């Protein structure tokens, strides 16, 4: 009949593990999509990105300013369904008797088509969000500037030990105390992060402004990220895109 292959052993139905394997692929798509949607929702909360928002779209009937990431929320909702549907296929496969019964029939007529339909909806939403995503670099820079003083403390500590001959334990304790004080100022009074000013003013560190500025350069914390990203896009993503374009 022209089929490339056949199951070597089969009863009145093929093994329902095949259904599980098919839904496993769809579940994998849903898992990745759900992770993506969660990241977009979190970044949207931080005002670093916005998913597409139509000119006449209303985010809330009561709060006119709202721009909820409703597409990402729908991706998360549908993904949850597809991920859970995989368990349905697993239970069906495990419940087959001897040469297999037909108590799976009505179930799989629902679960398999619905999984494909839901995954199709997920991917449609996924494409819509990606194509219309707005990124706000200045907000990302603001959040980085807020947290960078804390991130830089390890570099400051190591520099002061190696280049200034400082006592590691004493420097570590000084950084801890200044970090706690700066954190309290932020959380209790809504103040700005003044950790770097505290460190600069403390003679135990012996740092100049120029030295401190060099230690908190954001590019010093990215490591191989740029190279890894470019390599991944070139070697992994581009071949797949070229295959389907």
Across the structure, where does each feature detected by a protein language model lie?
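Glycine-rich cofactor/substrate-binding loops
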Residues: 48, 65-245
């Amino acid at each position: 009949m022209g089929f490339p292959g056949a199951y070597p052993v089969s009863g009145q139905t093929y093994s329902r593990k095949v259904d599980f394997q098919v839904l496993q692929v769809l579940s994998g798509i849903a898992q990745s999509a759900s992770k993506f949607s969660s990241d977009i929702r979190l970044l949207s909360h931080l005002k670093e990105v916005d998913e597409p928002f139509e000119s006449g779209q209303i985010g809330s009937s009561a709060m006119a300013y709202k721009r909820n990431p409703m597409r990402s929320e729908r991706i998360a909702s549908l993904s949850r369904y597809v991920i859970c549907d995989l368990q349905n296929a697993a239970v069906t496969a495990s419940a087959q008797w001897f040469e297999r019964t037909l108590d799976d029939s009505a179930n799989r007529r629902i679960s398999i088509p619905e999984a494909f339909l839901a995954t199709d909806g997920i991917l449609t939403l996924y494409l819509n969000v990606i194509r219309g995503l707005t990124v706000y670099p200045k907000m990302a820079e603001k959040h980085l500037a807020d947290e960078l003083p804390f991130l830089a403390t390890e570099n400051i500590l190591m520099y002061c030990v190696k280049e200034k001959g400082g006592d590691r334990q004493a420097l570590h304790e000084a950084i801890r105390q200044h970090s706690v004080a700066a954190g309290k100022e932020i959380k209790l009074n809504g103040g700005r992060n003044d950790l770097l000013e505290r460190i600069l003013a403390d003679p135990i560190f012996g740092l100049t402004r120029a030295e401190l500025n060099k230690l908190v350069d954001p590019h010093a914390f990215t490591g191989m990220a740029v190279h890894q990203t470019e390599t991944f896009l070139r070697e992994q993503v581009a071949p797949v895109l070229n295959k389907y374009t």
